[in-house]
């Protein structure tokens, strides 16, 4: 009886999250706690490649994005407004609608003759799902882990967050369990290695013009960072994605990644919020505290 009652309560909670009037996330949410954390940056290759592996998203990047030519500028331009959908409080829905507007003209036909549009509900939701999973992966590996209840809370919050975009809620799974099935299915059956994905794996960070350093030295400095991100991505990919990408991962690699994650977690205990948090997240916390 108690199990059935718990299931009914969970279903009501999730259904309410999907049908209720959009309410922005606040400072007590786990999404606020993790999404603006600097450690999410370590998963740049992971999230960028997973998004680009989705055929419609990859085609849009190949045809319309400057990501591959100017990665730093493109990431900065994208991350700042997306942070706002989480941290802007009463303006979060307006920020979400603005982001939706940015994508209205991204459409076309890919090399295989398939039509794509950035505002296709399935495509738009997949991008959002990768941000949700980014939070879970960062928290699990680099911030001390999550309980099952916290994962379910983050699932409900990701639904609440998604409502800020004013998109169709049709693709959004009803429960945490259904989301896990959705994620497994897309990773197993729908993702593909395309040009946009390969270029993320081989991405280089162009030297800014104001940096007074020879380009070859700059490139050598960034090589270990990009290689490290590829290694982290390999470890956090689902096995089906890792296999499709031709990446190798051993039990020893997993042990090393877990130890590295513990070291990162320990190091960040001494990092002040002014460094640890994205500026939009820091401003939101200060605003919530009346500062």
Predicted regions and their residues:
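Mature, function-bearing regions of proteins
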Residues: 3-291
């Amino acid at each position: 009886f108690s199990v059935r009652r718990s299931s009914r309560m969970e279903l009501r909670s999730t259904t309410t999250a999907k049908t209720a009037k959009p309410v922005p996330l606040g400072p007590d949410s786990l999404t606020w706690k993790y999404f603006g954390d600097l450690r999410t940056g370590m998963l740049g290759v992971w999230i960028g490649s997973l998004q680009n592996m989705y055929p419609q998203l990859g085609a849009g990047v190949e045809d319309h994005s400057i990501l591959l030519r100017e990665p730093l500028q493109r990431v900065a331009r994208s991350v700042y407004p997306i942070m706002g959908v989480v941290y802007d409080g009463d303006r979060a829905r307006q920020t979400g609608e603005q982001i939706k507007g940015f994508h209205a003209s991204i459409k076309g036909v890919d090399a295989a003759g398939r039509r794509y549009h950035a505002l296709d509900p399935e495509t738009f939701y997949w991008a959002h799902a990768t941000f949700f999973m980014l939070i879970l992966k960062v928290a699990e590996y680099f911030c001390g882990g999550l309980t099952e209840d916290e994962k379910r809370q983050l699932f409900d919050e990701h639904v609440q967050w998604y409502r800020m975009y004013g998109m169709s809620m049709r693709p959004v799974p009803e429960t945490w369990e259904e989301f896990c099935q959705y994620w497994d299915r897309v990773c197993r059956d729908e993702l593909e290695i395309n040009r946009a994905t390969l270029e993320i794996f081989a991405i280089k960070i162009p030297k800014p013009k104001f940096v007074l350093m020879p380009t070859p030295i700059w490139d050598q400095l960034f090589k270990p960072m990009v290689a490290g991100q590829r290694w982290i991505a390999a470890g956090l990919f689902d096995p089906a994605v890792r296999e499709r990408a031709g990446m190798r991962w051993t039990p020893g690699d997993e042990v090393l990644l877990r130890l590295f994650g513990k070291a990162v977690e320990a190091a960040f205990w001494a990092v002040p919020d002014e460094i640890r948090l994205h500026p939009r997240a820091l401003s939101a916390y200060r605003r919530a505290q009346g500062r």
